[in-house]
């Protein structure tokens, strides 16, 4: 069955994206594909292909999520996997993302989505390594270690989105399907 490839996310304000762009330039390494700044976000839940007939029910369910706006900030920088050849470089975030995630999971379970069994780890993907290898991993580990205490400032999470993701050869294209104020 095909449908609309969807996910729930928090967008970052412009000044945070600018700071992330400066950070990306400091970790740029051959083999690391940096995420375009306009695509940077915090994924709360990936839904996969949602039948068009179900999108309204998803939107209605998400509109019932109630949580106060909350402050957030970058708390760490790391990689997936944590050991061995790096595949993803990310920024870890602190804030009330865990509660938002749980509320989104609860709301979507009512309309038939399975709850995520893995623990939620709020993060922003900075880049992906196309062909992981020891040389690229060593260089990235060195750069990340030197930037470990980076402070990108704080921002307020006051809304989240249901987004459509269209995969193209040039990379994904995201479109907001619905916005939910906190």
In which residue ranges do the predicted regions lie?
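Histidine-dependent nucleotide/RNA phosphoesterase domain, centered on the 2H-phosphoesterase fold
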Residues: 1-182
């Amino acid at each position: 069955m095909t449908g609309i490839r969807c996910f729930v996310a928090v967008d970052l304000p412009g000044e945070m994206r600018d700071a992330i762009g400066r950070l990306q330039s400091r970790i740029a390494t051959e083999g690391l594909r940096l995420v375009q700044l306009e695509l940077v976000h915090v994924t709360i839940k990936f839904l996969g292909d949602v039948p068009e007939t179900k999108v309204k029910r998803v939107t209605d369910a998400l509109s019932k999520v109630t949580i106060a706006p909350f402050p957030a900030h970058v708390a760490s920088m790391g990689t997936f996997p944590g050991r061995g050849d790096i595949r993803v470089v990310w920024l870890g975030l602190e804030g009330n993302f865990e509660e938002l995630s749980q509320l989104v999971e609860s709301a979507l379970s009512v309309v038939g989505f399975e709850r995520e069994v893995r623990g939620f780890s709020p993060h922003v993907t900075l880049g992906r390594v196309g062909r992981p290898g020891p040389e690229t991993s060593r260089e990235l580990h060195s750069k990340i270690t030197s930037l470990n205490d980076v402070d990108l400032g704080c921002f307020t999470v006051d809304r989240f989105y249901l987004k459509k993701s269209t995969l193209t050869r040039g990379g994904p294209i995201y479109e907001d399907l619905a916005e939910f104020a906190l």
